[in-house]
Amino acid sequence: MALDKDIVGSIEFLEVVGLQGSTYLLKGPNGENVKLNQSEMNDDDELEVGEEYSFFIYPNRSGELFATQNMPDITKDKYDFAKVLKTDRDGARIDVGLPREVLVPWEDLPKVKSLWPQPGDYLLVTLRIDRENHMYGRLASESVVENMFTPVHDDNLKNEVIEAKPYRVLRIGSFLLSESGYKIFVHESERKAEPRLGESVQVRIIGHNDKGELNGSFLPLAHERLDDDGQVIFDLLVEYDGELPFWDKSSPEAIKEVFNMSKGSFKRAIGHLYKQKIINIETGKIALTKKGWSRMDSKE
C-alpha cells in the first residue's frame, strides 16, 4: 500500500497505539503506520497508549516511516544550514539532526566538481520527499533566500569583514548568506578564485543595493595588497602551517637561500606585514595572525 507522504518530513501529532519490544507503534492522522525506537524518545518522556505526542516523521532507506522526538534542524517546510559529512559520486551527504544522513543529489550540485562542498562545509537546505517516499536535501533557491535574508539599508557594515557561506555559485559571481542573515553578492571581478558551495569564507563588505542586499569582495583593500616580497613570505608561511624560523636578526645567507631576497628586502617586507597585522614577529620566528589566516580563507 502506498504511504501517505503528507506527514513525512514534518512535525506532527501521532497517537501511540502499542509497544512491541523496544519499539512503539504510532498511528498518523491519515492512518499511517509509524514506528518509534525508544532511543529516539526524550529522556524524561513516558509514552502512554492512546495518547498523542509530537514527533518528526522520516522514512528509512527502504521508505518505511519512523518517528523521533529529537527534532531536526530542518524540515520540508524549514531551511537551515546543514553540515556536510562526506561526498561521493551520488552527491553530498549531510547531517540534519536525524539518525540517518540525508543526500543532496549530484544533479543539484555545481557542474564544476571542484566547487562541490567538502566535509565540514554547510549547505543551506530543506527536506524533499519524492514519490517513492525517499528523503533528500534540497538546496535553497534564490527566491527562498529573498524571503529569509536580513536587509541592510546603511553603510555601517562597509569595509567590515564577516563570515558567510555560498549558497549559489555561478561564473558571474558568488551568492552568500551569513549567520546573521545578510545576503551578499561577490562579483567575479572581486575574487581571485571561486569558493566552494557551502564553504565558510571571509568577505569584505563594499556596499549595498536598494533591496538591502550587500555587495562584497574577497580582495583586500588596495593599501593592504602585498608587494612581491611580501607575497613570497606570506605564501611560504601558509605552506608551512603559519610559522617560519626567521626574523629580523636571521643571517643574510639563510634569508637569501630560503626567500631569494636580500636581508634588507626581507626586513622591509616583514615590517609591512607586521604593520598590516598579517604576521607577528617573535624571537626567532614569524607567524601568521588570525587576520593573516583570513586572507587565505578569503582566497587571497
Curated annotation (Swiss-Prot):
InterPro entries per record: CvfB_fam, CvfB_S1_2nd, CvfB_S1_3rd, CvfB_S1_st, CvfB_WH, NA-bd_OB-fold, WH-like_DNA-bd_sf
Keyword Nucleus appears in the UniProt entry: no
Cystine crosslinks: none
Keywords (A to Z) from UniProt: Virulence
Highest taxon listed in the record's lineage: Bacteria
PANTHER family assigned to the protein according to its UniProt record, in alphabetical order: CONSERVED VIRULENCE FACTOR B (PTHR37296:SF1)
Family according to the record: Belongs to the CvfB family.
The protein's role, per its UniProt record: Contributes to the expression of virulence factors and to pathogenicity via both agr-dependent and agr-independent pathways. Involved in the production of hemolysin, DNase, protease and protein A. Contributes to virulence in silkworm-infection model and murine model of systemic infection.
Protein name (record): Conserved virulence factor B
Lineage per the UniProt record: Bacteria, Bacillati, Bacillota, Bacilli, Bacillales
